[in-house]
From Swiss-Prot:
List of residues binding [4Fe-4S] cluster: C122, C125, C213
Enzyme class: transferase
Annotated compartments: Cytoplasm
Protein name: tRNA-cytidine(32) 2-sulfurtransferase
Name of the encoding gene: ttcA
Length: 311
């Protein structure tokens, strides 16, 4: 009995540490990008996956101690996919006492009609979903739309665009929506996916599978995700350094004439950002820039619990 109590206390201790880390990450992102302001009504897009559950939980937690007042309304889009457990989210949100709205739109039928069997449907589905969510935000009087993308999603998008699109373009933590009427925020921008996975398992969120539509996975994104995970295992701190690089861009040392006036450089121009280091021996730090070792990840393994299977 004492051993069971000891393990329970340890699990709770580790869960509290993990929640504090996620809360700190979200709080820093909100502050750095001014994501939430006094009186904001935040529409939290809830898919039923680990990321959106975690986002809602951390925002609710921050709401209790934030120096400003803001409200939350959770929104789920029921796209009429076969086997979608429509009872799960209402029951969960009512138990929490969170204001919510379930939007029912048969986008699944539209996608199946337009996209050949076996092909990836995510692109069309995403466009349809985006339009519906913008409309819903207007109807609810939401001032911000919160999406559950995390740090790993942002880095994956950067590499996808570099490898396949020829652009250095990631996923912004805050942006104006396509229709120019809404501000979209990503409060989990600084959060590691592996932390979110552990938190979701420990909290036993009622996860809804994301493959109910039967669409094939994005193989290009999967390749990038596997590459980043491999780097993270083999070279601890590399992911942190790459993300830090996205926050320390030096346009004068790239090749985009829209970002820096290369043509305007003449004799007598000032040295910019350290000048030319091409002939210098670069001093590479022993540890990646911006990286600090987290607490022993093995200690967090105690958080691993079974995720509720949705029948």
């Amino acid at each position: 009995m004492q051993e069971i109590q000891k393990n329970t206390k340890k699990e709770q201790y580790n869960l509290n540490k993990l929640q504090k880390r996620l809360r700190r990450n979200v709080g820093e992102a909100i502050a750095d990008f001014n994501m939430i302001e006094e009186g904001d009504r935040i529409m939290v897009c809830l898919s039923g996956g680990k990321d959106s559950y975690t986002m809602l939980e951390i925002l609710r937690n921050l709401q209790q101690s934030a120096p400003i007042n803001f409200s939350l309304v959770a929104v789920n889009l029921d796209q009429k996919q076969p086997g979608f457990p429509e009872h799960i989210l209402p029951a969960y949100l009512e138990q929490l006492g969170v204001e919510y709205k379930i939007v029912e739109e048969n986008t699944y039928g539209i996608v199946k009609e337009k996209i050949p069997e076996g092909k990836t449907t995510c692109s069309l589905c995403s466009r349809l979903r985006r339009g519906i969510l913008y409309r819903t935000a207007t109807e609810l009087g939401a001032t911000k739309i919160a999406l559950g993308h995390h740090r790993d999603d942002i880095l994956q998008t950067l590499f996808l665009n570099m490898f396949y699109g020829g652009k250095m373009k990631g996923m912004p933590p805050k942006l104006m929506s396509d229709d120019g009427k809404h501000i979209v925020i990503r409060p989990l921008a600084y959060c590691r996916e592996k932390d979110i996975v552990r938190f979701a398992e420990a909290k036993a969120f009622p996860i809804i599978p994301c493959n109910l539509c039967g669409s094939q996975p994005n193989l290009q994104r999967q390749v990038i995700a596997d590459m980043l995970r491999d780097w993270d295992k083999r070279y601890p701190g590399r992911i942190e350094t790459m993300f830090s690089a996205m926050q320390n861009v030096v346009p004068s040392h790239l090749c985009d004439t829209n970002l820096f006036d290369f043509k305007g450089i003449t004799h007598g121009s000032e040295v910019v950002d350290g000048g030319d280091l091409a002939f210098d021996r670069e001093e590479i730090p022993l540890q990646p820039a911006g990286w600090q070792p987290e607490e022993d990840d093995t200690a967090l393994e105690a958080l691993r619990l079974d995720v509720i299977e949705v029948k």
